[in-house]
């Protein structure tokens, strides 16, 4: 796989789970002899939702909820076939979304 890069983008709501998965991917890639660029922290997306506290009165009384989506970016430079096999067999946490581009 000469001259190819694998770009891995990870997303999760909990940054601790995301960082643990990132460390697992980096250690697996380094163990199989590939060079790793990153992890690069991407901007956190914050979605805020405002709702009324009461069902039908008191418009001024509101409550806000937020959802934070944390993201990381990894580049694996010149991966070996062993790297690709090891990454395919890797079992990550349930709350992590993984996007892979070749």
Swiss-Prot record:
PANTHER family xrefs: 30S RIBOSOMAL PROTEIN S10 FAMILY MEMBER
Question: To which protein family does this belong?
Answer: Belongs to the universal ribosomal protein uS10 family.
Its function?
Involved in the binding of tRNA to the ribosomes.
Name the gene behind this protein.
rpsJ
Which molecular function terms from Gene Ontology are attached?
A: structural constituent of ribosome; tRNA binding
User: Which GO cellular component terms are attached?
Assistant: ribonucleoprotein complex; ribosome
GO term, biological process aspect, one? translation
Keywords for the protein's UniProt record, in alphabetical order = Ribonucleoprotein, Ribosomal protein
Mind telling me what this protein is named? Small ribosomal subunit protein uS10
Spell out the subunit comment: Part of the 30S ribosomal subunit.
Specify whether Cell wall biogenesis/degradation is a keyword of the entry.
no
**Which Pfam families does the record associate with it?**
Ribosomal_S10
């Amino acid at each position: 796989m000469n001259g190819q890069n694998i770009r891995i983008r990870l997303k999760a709501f909990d940054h601790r789970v995301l960082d643990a998965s990132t460390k697992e991917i980096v250690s697996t890639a380094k163990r199989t002899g590939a060079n790793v660029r990153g992890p690069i922290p991407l901007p956190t997306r914050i979605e805020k939702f405002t709702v009324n506290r009461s069902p039908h009165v008191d418009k001024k009384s509101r409550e806000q909820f937020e959802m934070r989506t944390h993201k990381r970016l990894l580049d694996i430079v010149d991966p070996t076939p062993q790297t690709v096999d090891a990454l395919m067999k890797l079992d990550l946490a349930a709350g992590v979304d993984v996007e892979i581009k070749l």
